[in-house]
């Protein structure tokens, strides 16, 4: 019930801000996500006392509000599930900082089955870790698409913001089959501080790539 009341207050405020601003832009995904008055710098209209995720796509910024956070323990590892909502009620579900599902956007991941390596184990590994994720992608009814991923300790990508001391960077090398044939090969980057992803660069498709930064609790 508390999560539901939070969602009504935080998302309601963001949705109202979106209506005031007109939600106009160039990128269709940004049009759907926009929750602030137009401009490159985020004039964020957010509610105090709640946690937000800053999102950048094509150089424009917006915010999503945390609707729920849950820790699930499996095989001795803690999996942190977070559900982030925009002012237009789009939702991005992240697990340990990685996009797991995304609904209401121009590209949706409706289901995922994967077992990505835990950040702590990656930090201790001297070699890349190879794994797979199976996702259902819309539009196009691409059910069971299998991406092959190699993850390893890395360095900050060009243009990434400075991070606190002790932050460790990781990089994904992703090979994703495309509907017209061939593979889309790209990188994803994650900054992990005290076991938590505080900044990342991730993609849903070749045309929908995000930069995520945790804003924390807005006072």
Locations of the language-model features?
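Bacterial N-terminal signal peptides that target proteins for export
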Residues: 2-14
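Generic surface-pattern signal
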Residues: 13-16, 124
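C-terminal motif of bacterial Sec signal peptides marking the signal peptidase cleavage site
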Residues: 19-22
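Acidic, serine/threonine-rich low-complexity disordered tracts
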Residues: 24-101, 106-111, 125-219
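A small/polar (G/S/T-enriched), proline-flanked helix-loop surface module common
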Residues: 113-121
């Amino acid at each position: 019930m508390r999560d539901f009341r939070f969602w009504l207050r935080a998302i309601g405020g963001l949705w109202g801000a979106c209506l005031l601003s007109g939600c106009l832009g160039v990128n269709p995904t940004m049009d759907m996500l926009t929750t602030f008055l137009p401009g490159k710098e985020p004039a964020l209209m957010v509610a105090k006392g709640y946690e937000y995720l800053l999102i950048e796509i094509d150089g424009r910024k917006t915010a999503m509000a945390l609707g729920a956070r849950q820790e699930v323990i499996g095989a001795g590892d803690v999996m942190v599930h977070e559900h982030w909502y925009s002012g237009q009620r789009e939702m991005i579900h992240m697990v340990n900082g990685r996009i797991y599902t995304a609904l209401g956007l121009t590209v949706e991941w409706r289901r995922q089955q994967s077992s990505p390596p835990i950040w702590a184990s990656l930090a201790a590994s001297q070699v890349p870790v190879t794994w797979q994720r199976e996702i259902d992608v819309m539009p196009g009814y691409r059910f069971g698409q299998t991406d092959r991923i190699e993850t390893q300790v890395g360095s900050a990508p060009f243009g990434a913001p400075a991070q606190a001391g002790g932050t460790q960077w990781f990089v994904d090398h992703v090979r994703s089959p495309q509907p017209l044939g061939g593979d889309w090969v790209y990188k994803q980057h994650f900054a992990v501080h005290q076991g938590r992803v505080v900044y990342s660069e991730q993609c849903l498709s070749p045309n929908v790539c995000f930069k995520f930064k945790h804003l924390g609790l807005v006072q």
